[in-house]
Design a protein with these regions (language model features):
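FIC/Doc superfamily catalytic core
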Residues: 2-208
Length: 208
């Protein structure tokens, strides 16, 4: 099944919605370890199930697969046996104590740590739609994993994307990234979603 994840903040005092993140990819829902919790009648469990399912799904977009330890720890959190902070602490300790690291190709440690951090971000209510928040989210997700976490690149890049059948994407000039971010965010803040269908909203977000 091909899926989009669109997470929006709604401003109760206006018709605007503020985008946090949009991703697309493929996921076999029959293999989703949190599937049973998505049907839970208990709101808290259902919400946690969606949070963890989304976090793991976003890793799958980059071809990353979390460990069974992460899945088991997440389920403990969903069932209320441990808090999210305790779940994160267990994940951090798990890798601090491991004598053998997985290969770079598997990148399981990255998948586990980033999944738990995404789950935390999706559970928070505080949010500011700004370039600084955008950069802060990157820092929070990838701290200790990548040296450039939370930093705007200072060099130009190109990248082949599997979602585009290997086509090469040329990214914006490094010298203009900050100005480009400021402009794009200001344009989005002024955009009104009033009267748009879900499909039209997703189309606009994808272009943004």
């Amino acid at each position: 099944m091909f899926w989009f994840i669109v997470i929006l903040r709604y401003n109760k005092n206006s018709s605007r919605k503020t985008k946090i993140v949009i991703y697309s990819g493929e996921m076999n829902m029959d293999k989703d370890p949190f599937k049973e919790y998505l049907r839970e009648s208990e709101p808290n469990k259902a919400t946690k199930g969606y949070v963890w399912s989304t976090a793991v799904g976003l890793q799958a977009v980059d071809g990353l697969k979390p460990s069974q330890y992460l899945i088991d720890t997440a389920i403990q959190n969903i069932e209320g046996k441990i808090t999210l902070k305790e779940a994160q602490s267990l994940i951090e300790s798990y890798y601090n104590e491991r004598p053998v690291r997985v290969s770079d190709n598997e990148r399981t440690e990255e998948a586990d740590k980033v999944s738990s951090r995404i789950a935390e971000l999706l559970s928070e209510t505080a949010f500011s739609f700004s370039p600084n928040e955008y950069i802060a989210i990157h820092r929070k997700l990838f701290r200790g994993i990548y040296k450039h976490a939370g930093k705007i690149r200072d060099y130009n890049i190109t990248k082949k994307e599997w979602v585009l059948d290997g086509a090469t994407v040329v990214y914006g000039s490094a010298s203009e990234l900050r100005a480009t971010l400021e402009y794009d965010f200001s344009q989005e803040k002024d955009f009104s979603y009033k009267g748009l269908s879900i499909e039209e909203s997703i189309h606009h977000l994808a272009l943004f």
